[in-house]
Amino acid sequence: LVGSEMCIRDRFMICEVIDMNIISTEKAPGAIGPYSQGYTVGGLVFTSGQIPVDPATGAVAEGIAAQADQSCRNVGAILEAAGVGFDKVVKTTCFLADIADFAAFNEVYAKYFTSKPARSCVAVKDLPKGVLCEIEAVAEA
């Protein structure tokens, strides 16, 4: 969708066209703000944070295990739309509404992210729509 030109200045000016493409899929919930579901740029895939909204119904399941599962499936749908899988993920950032859910969240997360990418997991005060978790990922394209 967007082509950008990156220039590196040193003794010489080197310009390289970097393809930047928006990722969009109906298999993951649409953005609830002014952002895209994901982007590919420079050989990487970046997903926006995925909350546990069922893309078909808009429903949010109850409990951390069900919500973690849906968030992982939403991330997977965006990765799939970019032509990659969970095995290409190199970094995730996970947000929990309650750090007490850490163990239960990890149990579900580990079933999807079997290659054990680098990860940050933090508890936050609030998440959109009152959900219990959110996951964003960076993958090799």
Feature roles, as predicted:
Residues 1-8:
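Short, small-residue-biased leader/transition segments that mark boundaries at the very start
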Residues 2, 16-19:
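Acidic, Ala/Val/Gly-enriched low-complexity intrinsically disordered segments
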Residues 19-141:
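Short, polar/acidic, helix-capping and beta-turn segments at strand->helix junctions
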